[in-house]
Amino acid sequence: MEDINFASLAPRHGSRPFMGTWNEIGTSQLNGGAFSWSSLWSGIKNFGSSIKSFGNKAWNSNTGQMLRDKLKDQNFQQKVVDGLASGINGVVDIANQALQNQINQRLENSRQPPVALKQRPTPEPEEVEVEEKLPPLETAPPLPSKGEKRPRPELEETLVVESREPPSYEQALKEGASYPMTRPIGSMARPVYGKEKTPVTLELPPPAPTVPPMPTPTLGTNVPRLAAPTVAVATPARRVRGANWQSTLNSIVGLGVKSLKRRRCY
């Protein structure tokens, strides 16, 4: 049978197993035991008494005495009293300002009319009709009817435009075709191509020669055949090769030098 460590099952005091007597289980000596208020109060009293004794020692020491003398020289107590008094006066002033603001607001609300009076519509001013005599209107002259003409004033100028009729066809042929002019005004116009009045003709190329029609062949007659026209064919001129080694090499034709491969063992 294997050995079993029963110490892991025992109650613990921190990380150490508690293997002593069992009558102290449930008291304040173990973790999770009963809480003692008397021990807490005694600890607080001891802490307060230690602070008091330390303060008395510091106050009665030479350093404390020098500090008290310095505070008396600077009138520290009077400054503290003045500060407290100024703070109290400031609080009182703030309260007075808040009270005065509330009083002013209530007075303004009492002076304003109620809401019912605001909703009432204000009476509109009455309209009074006043008759005024206007000057007579100027009557416009009557417009002439469509059939009647408008009378002309005495001092009215009439613009007359004279237009020349184009010449007749026969007259234009007699005069001949005119050359284009350089200016549109008659006195300043000059012909472009000369002063002679010659008719303009259209030069056309001469007509192509016509081929006479061939007679229709009949039985027993030989049909003459037309000879084909001779056509000149241009042949390229041969290059004259110079008598040098390059032309000689170019004229050589053949397979070149014959070569023979032989394997020999030594």
Curated annotation (Swiss-Prot):
Could you name the Gene Ontology cellular component terms for this entry? Answer: host cell; host cell cytoplasm; host cell nucleus; viral capsid; viral procapsid
UniProt region (Disordered), positions on chain? 105-175
The UniProt keywords, alphabetically, are:
Capsid protein, Cytoplasmic inwards viral transport, Disulfide bond, Host cytoplasm, Host nucleus, Host-virus interaction, Late protein, Microtubular inwards viral transport, Phosphoprotein, Ubl conjugation, Viral capsid assembly, Viral penetration into host cytoplasm, Viral penetration via lysis of host organellar membrane, Viral release from host cell, Virion, Virus entry into host cell
**What are the site positions for Cleavage?**
G33, A34, L255, G256
One Pfam family linked to the record: MCPVI
Q: What else is known?
A: All late proteins expressed from the major late promoter are produced by alternative splicing and alternative polyadenylation of the same gene giving rise to non-overlapping ORFs. A leader sequence is present in the N-terminus of all these mRNAs and is recognized by the viral shutoff protein to provide expression although conventional translation via ribosome scanning from the cap has been shut off in the host cell.
Q: What is this protein called?
A: Pre-protein VI
Q: What gene name is listed for this protein?
A: L3
